[in-house]
């Protein structure tokens, strides 16, 4: 499973093989509800970059599905949430709307990328209220219990 990053313009024509894009989806796997939202803060012209308002609108379009499934277990994004492992410069600022999702639905896990650990600004694992936040930059294995 994957969501688009800010440098994934080539995926519009040639998506990666052997995986499923969950961008703008509430994907369910063996009872595990996974909400996918790719992209970063808009800092230049290009695909998969959004303003705060655009990201909020993307989430609003998924609201009925989220409500019907009674929330989600994993939030998978490219960018972090605002104030939770993000940076100060525009390309690395997080989205307010992601933090709003964490506040409203309290998923067990929030998995994001974009914040390269060699930047020295971000921890691999952190916690926000009841949600474990994982910066999955490069790769990271997470064992997540499947709901009964």
Predicted segment positions?
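Conserved catalytic scaffold of divalent metal-dependent phosphoesterases
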Residues: 6-97
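Active-site environment of divalent metal-dependent phosphoester hydrolases
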Residues: 3-13, 42-46, 81-85, 108-126, ...
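Binuclear metal-dependent phosphoesterase catalytic core
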Residues: 28-30, 99-105, 109, 117-148
């Amino acid at each position: 499973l994957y969501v688009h990053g800010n440098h994934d313009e080539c995926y519009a024509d040639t998506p990666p093989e052997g995986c499923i894009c969950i961008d703008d989806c509430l994907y369910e796997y063996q009872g595990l509800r996974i909400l996918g939202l790719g992209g970063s803060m808009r800092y230049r012209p290009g695909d998969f970059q959004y303003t705060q308002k655009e990201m909020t609108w993307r989430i609003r379009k998924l609201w009925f599905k989220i409500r019907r499934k009674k929330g989600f277990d994993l939030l998978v994004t490219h960018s972090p949430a605002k104030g939770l492992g993000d940076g100060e410069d525009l390309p690395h600022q997080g989205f307010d709307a992601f933090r709003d999702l964490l506040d409203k639905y309290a998923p067990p896990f929030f998995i994001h990328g974009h914040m390269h650990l060699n930047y020295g600004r971000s921890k691999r694992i952190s916690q926000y209220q009841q949600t474990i936040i994982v910066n999955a930059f490069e790769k990271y294995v997470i064992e997540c219990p499947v709901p009964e």
